[in-house]
Amino acid sequence: MGQLISFFQDIPIFFEEALNVALAVVTLLAIIKGIVNVWKSGILQLFVFLVLAGRSCSFKVGHHTNFESFTVKLGGVFHELPSLCRVNNSYSLIRLSHNSNQALSVEYVDVHPVLCSSSPTILDNYTQCIKGSPEFDWILGWTIKGLGHDFLRDPRICCEPKKTTNAEFTFQLNLTDSPETHHYRSKIEVGIRHLFGNYITNDSYSKMSVVMRNTTWEGQCSNSHVNTLRFLVKNAGYLVGRKPLAFFSWSLSDPKGNDMPGGYCLERWMLVAGDLKCFGNTAVAKCNLNHDSEFCDMLRLFDFNKNAIEKLNNQTKTAVNMLTHSINSLISDNLLMRNKLKEILKVPYCNYTRFWYINHTKSGEHSLPRCWLVSNGSYLNESDFRNEWILESDHLIAEMLSKEYQDRQGKTPLTLVDLCFWSAIFFTTSLFLHLVGFPTHRHIQGDPCPLPHRLDRNGACRCGRFQKLGKQVTWKRKH
């Protein structure tokens, strides 16, 4: 302890000597440089690795990057659009909206049509049969068109009008097999499969009619937003190429249709609950560049949903037609039908329900969500596409580094960077020239410098004052 006190007392005297100061500086620099060299050598990292190896089994892609996912809940997106589901092979339901307690039942039965003798003629107008229930007008039109019925060429639809306010109305499509209606029956069967999914058929007991009635929704089956998308696309008049046109622009909104420039926050009303993630303008910009992603299809659907929600609140057929034109631009290359083909061929496909992405927990950056594929009715295991999300992690890191580089380039003037670079080149070149030492003038061997005269190789002055001396000359660098 006494030696330590004596050392502190002698510090002023110690630093009075310049040599001691130099030694202290050199010692400090050597210690710091030694620590840096030891750290860069990797021996400390190797020791930490050997101590912690096998103690952490967390599911992480890399440093500060996590593999995360979320599930789309279409009920939060389409508040006013119908939802479809199948109860059994012959009974399906179309709920008017996700908040409605009314539904339209579609039965594929083997009962012979009995209503056509006394029913009114229906030509795309259902008012006479659904008196007191105008909310079923457009859903009936979409369902009949979705099944593939043509009012001009196909057999007429029969209906039994409502007798009272709370009574049922009934519509029947005649599928009795005959040479004239065989094609019509096949077309309706294809429409049922397309809207409600595959079902088991028994060729020995052929169905004779499709019956549609109004009923109440009591949770008879679970909704499928894939069927809802098929229902919307089936009623679209045409499909256009999926790419932003010259006048195309993104419009961000909340569930009520109000502009929300902050981005798509996927919480509560939209995709996921619990403030999981907000995909803002960055994701929108990526979708404008790479618009072949299933997630971009969903974002485009949300974008069109803004005006659709405002118009559907009026519960008019014009509003529904406006939504039809919006859906036309949703999925151009018909991904739903393509996925249906993949489902039949047992190839993994996207059902627009679950998406995965890479999240950088430290910076908050994330990759554009990609669809979690389905095979044989279940989601793929994470190990089945491990290479894909590891590669996506690398792309995210590369994108972040590129943004940081561009940001730094923007903060540092390029002229200053160029000036610093060329000044360093000039200093290095001048140092090299200084070490080489180029000769500058001639001397007569054994004589002093002849300044201000300059000698030629014969020892004579170039100005003519001195004649040839015949003495040896040599080059010198310094005077």
Curated annotation (Swiss-Prot):
UniProt keyword Lipoprotein present: yes
The name this protein goes by in its record: Pre-glycoprotein polyprotein GP complex
Disulfide bonding pattern of the chain: C85-C221, C265-C278, C287-C296, C350-C371
Family: Belongs to the arenaviridae GPC protein family.
Gene name per UniProt: GPC
GO cellular component: host cell endoplasmic reticulum membrane; host cell Golgi membrane; host cell plasma membrane; membrane; viral envelope; virion membrane
Top-rank taxon: Viruses
Function: Stable signal peptide (SSP): cleaved and functions as a signal peptide. In addition, it is also retained as the third component of the GP complex. The SSP is required for efficient glycoprotein expression, post-translational maturation cleavage of GP1 and GP2, glycoprotein transport to the cell surface plasma membrane, formation of infectious virus particles, and acid pH-dependent glycoprotein-mediated cell fusion.
HAMAP family reported for this sequence: ARENA_GPC
InterPro entries from the UniProt entry: Arena_glycoprot, Arena_glycoprot_zinc-bd
Transmembrane helix recorded as keyword: yes
UniProt site positions, description: Cleavage: S58, F59, L245, A246
Binding residues annotated for Zn(2+) 1, in chain numbering: C57, H453, C461, C463
Transmembrane segments: 18-32, 34-53, 419-439
Keyword terms of this UniProt record: Disulfide bond, Fusion of virus membrane with host endosomal membrane, Fusion of virus membrane with host membrane, Glycoprotein, Host cell membrane, Host endoplasmic reticulum, Host Golgi apparatus, Host membrane, Host-virus interaction, Lipoprotein, Membrane, Metal-binding, Myristate, Transmembrane, Transmembrane helix, Viral attachment to host cell, Viral envelope protein, Viral penetration into host cytoplasm, Virion, Virus endocytosis by host, Virus entry into host cell, Zinc
A biological-process GO annotation: receptor-mediated endocytosis of virus by host cell
MF GO annotations: metal ion binding
Extracellular side: 2-17, 54-58, 59-418
Residues in the Cytoplasmic compartment per record: 33, 440-479
Parts forming coiled coils: none
Lipid-substituted positions (N-myristoyl glycine): G2
Binding site for Zn(2+) 2: H441, H443, C449, H479
Site label Important for GP-C-mediated membrane fusion, positions: K33
Glycosylation site list: N88, N125, N174, N202, N214, N314, N351, N359, N376, N381
Domain remark in the UniProt entry: The cytoplasmic domain of GP2 plays a role in ER location. It also contains a zinc-binding domain that allows SSP retention in the GPC complex by accepting a cysteine from SSP as the fourth ligand.
